[in-house]
């Protein structure tokens, strides 16, 4: 078969017949260079999301010639990067987001990190970045957390955000699969994602002129380009007095995601059934870890129908007219659960009676998830820092 022009169908030159190429990195090979000057830890109550960083970071370099280098935990600092690196020109990159929580028993826990590692590998395939052993990456992250564990806030309203990032670093302006890459992990102590508070409802701006993702695209991958391309719509949402964008898709204005969140609708459906519904994973929805956890929790409860289905703005408007909507809320690692109170659509503000209804379900889900995350309830969804 003839090679495609971007080199996707052919192995790198350094991969042909070489037994020296390291197919993955190993946690046992970690090189640790401790920081000589440690920063002052911030007050958990004063944290701004993503603005403060810990003392150390993890880096692992890769090249087609030699494969993976040894992982390195080093003092937090700037990255040396070539001006022609593919990440800077063609957005060859991906990232993840997960959290470490200091429990009521002072133990540090991660919430379902295996799902983040799985998603990171799927995104790597889509971006043509090299594979690695996801269990080894998790071991390296745990070692990084062990070193910076005092940065995990002593608070049940704050956490330590973990940001693994994977970028193409080949110094070339050619549009092709990169022959060099860098995987790095940074840590940031965080409070509530939204400045208005962790459980204050948000308003949404829905306008079909902007589209977040489409079939065959990268909407189901956690890639920076998906977020950078959303900023103009987010600015317009704020100009219209709303806090987030409700992304629509197709001629029937299907409801997909909310800004940085998956979306749930708790309602009485067209058949008169009590139902918790969320858009399906059809290639344009990010498969959120919190989303999956909410679906599994609700299915375990068995108290109402739980459904992954397409929802349109007409479905929502009709349900609102019939007083069939109970709650709407977003979900995500950063926000956990966030109620929705209003949607601005076609010049009309649609009020969602989420807060008038408690919100009983959103509050229950938030309570259950945070009980697990902060160790108030034992669960196999968490792993403890050794």
From Swiss-Prot:
CDD domains in UniProt: BCAT_beta_family (cd01557)
Cofactor(s) recorded in Swiss-Prot or TrEMBL: pyridoxal 5'-phosphate
Enzyme class: transferase
Organism of derivation: Mus musculus (Mouse)
Name of the protein this chain belongs to: Branched-chain-amino-acid aminotransferase, cytosolic
Modified residues (N-acetylmethionine): 1
Keyword Amino-acid biosynthesis listed: yes
Catalytic activity: L-leucine + 2-oxoglutarate = 4-methyl-2-oxopentanoate + L-glutamate; L-isoleucine + 2-oxoglutarate = (S)-3-methyl-2-oxopentanoate + L-glutamate; L-valine + 2-oxoglutarate = 3-methyl-2-oxobutanoate + L-glutamate
Modification N6-(pyridoxal phosphate)lysine, positions: 222
Biological function: Catalyzes the first reaction in the catabolism of the essential branched chain amino acids leucine, isoleucine, and valine.
PANTHER family the UniProt entry points to: BRANCHED-CHAIN-AMINO-ACID AMINOTRANSFERASE, CYTOSOLIC, SUBGROUP IIII AMINOTRANSFERASE
